[in-house]
Amino acid sequence: MHIIIFIGTVNLLLLLITYFYYRINFPLSHSLSFGLIYLFLACNNIISRALPETAPLLLIKASSWLGGLWMAFAYYSLLLAVLHLLLWLASKFIGFHLPSEKLALVGVIAIFCFIAWGSINAYSPVVRTERITTAKLSHGENYKIVFLSDIHLGRLLGKDYAQRLTERVNQLQPDLVLVAGDVLDEKQAYVLKENSLAPLCQLKAPKGVFMAYGNHDYLDQPLSWQKRLEEQNIQVLRDSYAFVDGRIKLVGLEDYSKNKDVKELKRLSSNNQHYYTIILDHQPRRMQAASEAGYDLYLAGHTHTGQLFPNRLITKRIYLLDYGRAAFDSMTAITNNGYGYWGTPIRTEKAPEIVLIQLIGTGK
């Protein structure tokens, strides 16, 4: 219900602002048919969430797609309206003619092109390789780790998407798979309806598949969701840890949205000096604390690097490391761009990714 209220409020604001912008600058938008179509598209973000879970899956997906595409269009229309307003103000002060209808037309064409590219980009994952050396592991004691985050299985991303992800991961032949949360998008019902978790059971990693919860994993009965994940041989670490070969210690934290302090992070750091210690923390907010507690590798996701350009200007200012790799004293931190998406099937920032970590032992 909270998500519906939030989405509904955002949709209403976008609808009002962008509709009036087009009414001012596009003669065709004066027709009743334009208004009704625009209203219908805007309502799909609510319709897709309000449909009963027993509704046909195709209807749920179609409504979700229409609503998501409209939201991206409306977002960029809002940016276009702001740009148009600034140019209009400049024209009044400086005294030049602003061809408003032509500017709006060029802007709309650019938006459609941008969204078309973003819809392709959202389904074009890349593999990013990171090489890390450590003296805590013996020379020749190497691990190939696949690091994932933000898969977001649900109304838009289902079984086929999970199957392609599994195939891509298995092609990399990892020893270990780590997931930094948000396997779920919003409701389990859509995952169960399509059996979207089943392909993840086919992930081939001899040392195991482990994950920490993200904020979305709590949205629908987190305990039953954990049980379903573990039925697919995914071990969930919630303020807990596990060992790999007695050499690597894996720590998974509850998401920052549930527990903002660092008490558990510190408690779980006991004996870190004896192991190569990896910590999974969905939101990249506790890097400095992890470094001070003696962790070796900090893995996070969540940011999607804003997903829609130019939102990374915001994520860069919110998080210490919204994307990529950085060193915090002796600790390495990596933030994953995410494999899925949320809200709209568009990515106009960085492409979705799988991070392949080559952990190389250099010790005696």
Ranges and model annotations:
Residues 133-364:
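Soluble catalytic domains of enzymes that build or remodel membrane lipids, polysaccharides, and related
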Residues 107, 112-138, 155-160:
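Hydrophobic alpha-helical transmembrane segments in integral membrane proteins
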Residues 1-123, 364:
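Non-catalytic terminal accessory segments
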